[in-house]
Amino acid sequence: MRYPPSRLRALGAVGCVAALAALAACSSGGSSGSSSNSNSGTITVAVVSNPLITGQMIPLTTSSFEKQYPGIKVKFATYTEGDLRAAIEKNVSTHSNAFNVIMIGPYETPLFAKNGWLTDLSKQYIASDPGYDAGDLLPPIAKALSYKGDLYAAPFYGESSMMFYNKTLFKAAGLTMPTNPTWDQVQGFAAKLNQPGKVAGICLRGLAGWGDNMAALDTVVNTFGGQWFDMNWKPQLTSPAFTEATNFYVNLIRKYGEPGAANDSFNQLLTLYGQGKCAMWYDATVAATSIATTYPDVYKTTGYALAPVNKTKSSGWLWSWALGIPQGVSNSGAAWKYVSWATSKQYDQLVGQKYGWSAVPPGTRTSLYSNPDYQSAAKPFADITLQSINSTDPEHPTLNAVPYVGVQYVDVPQFESLGLTVGQQIAGAIAGTESVSQALQAGQSAASQYTPAQLSGG
């Protein structure tokens, strides 16, 4: 089920005539792209810096894509997650055309598409390119990257969130991790496994950002029954459920988490876990791929469990790093060639052959999860990753009805700023420079500056 268009908010006013004109200028059929220079030219691709990008996509672009398409030169602009979002929004909102391809996710894609900032991949390219096989994309991921039924960003990888744990440490302590643990159970495990100065009982995101500490915290808030706004768009950050969940998360880190947690997000925690310094780690399912390829010894001792819950049946987030083409960019045909290559079944084959099948970007295609080579190589985490993704429900992320879509975000343009602001306050609470109560009061005040009409798009 695709998110209702009425619930997707615009980031700002963009002239419909200009957007339609740009669309018409780009349109034509064929998988080779829409422009006369579809087989040549230089394209710049803005991407997030993480192992699947820097360790696979970028080198394979040089060794494979540019050899297959010698007339196309690919340049990369690599950013941290927060910097990437700022650079891309500036690029698309001002139509600077600095990037021919942009890496975005389910939060940005429908909002950008509604504003006319993205090329409709379904109509522009996929409709005349049956070899791309968009029907093979995992439904939750494809729906999250669509607007009014059309795909506007092609998924490079998809993810939910889950718990990673060190089986050796659990066995030594006489502990057993359930497949579907509760947060209370996790807290008990962390208390028993914590070895200050040596091994953290649990590692969690603390770095400020709506896609950093707030991504993990939001899943806790949801399963505790909290929400960002009620059905009248009144902020709920100081509600009992939101407060209880935040206190739980912050206290869990401060008591049993890694030192300096307020500076840590995915990349830092991957390193800590790979070094054996985390008894448990709650984060993106895609981390399983990075652990398998980067830390093979730790991979052998790693167990996996679903995202912990409290009052809900499931709580994992839903995300994808995907590739979109800004509306009206030059060399759009070459851009599509790159997007279709990097998100294809053939790319999966290429990665599997070169890096091993456990290294293939997960969470995008149904065919990957029926591939015997992948199932064999990624057996420990393949099925639980797929289960985690399929159990997400961005339209109903918490116990009560909400006026927004999103598990770890709220699908309004104001959330990018609001999520960062609240994330900064939570990072302060984790660092001990303010209390959780102070952090949430500040967050409530920040959310209250927006009127219901602004948030609802009315």
Where are these regions (language model features)?
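Glycine-centered hinge/linker elements that transmit conformational signals in sensory
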Residues: 189-192, 232-263, 303, 307
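Short helix-initiation/N-cap motifs at beta->coil->alpha
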Residues: 78-88, 107, 181-188, 260-274
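C-terminal lobe and pocket-closing loops
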Residues: 287-298, 311-321, 325-420
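Conserved C-terminal helix/tail region of periplasmic/extracytoplasmic solute-binding proteins
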Residues: 2, 171, 392-458
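Short, solvent-exposed loop/beta-turn-alpha elements that line the ligand-binding surface or hinge
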Residues: 119-137, 179, 202, 206-207, ...
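Hinge/lid segment of periplasmic solute-binding proteins
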Residues: 106-160, 213-216, 303-308, 386-390
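Extracytoplasmic/periplasmic solute-binding protein
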Residues: 147-156, 161, 184-235, 241-242, ...
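Conserved N-terminal structural module of periplasmic/extracytoplasmic solute-binding proteins
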Residues: 2-117, 127-133, 262, 311, ...
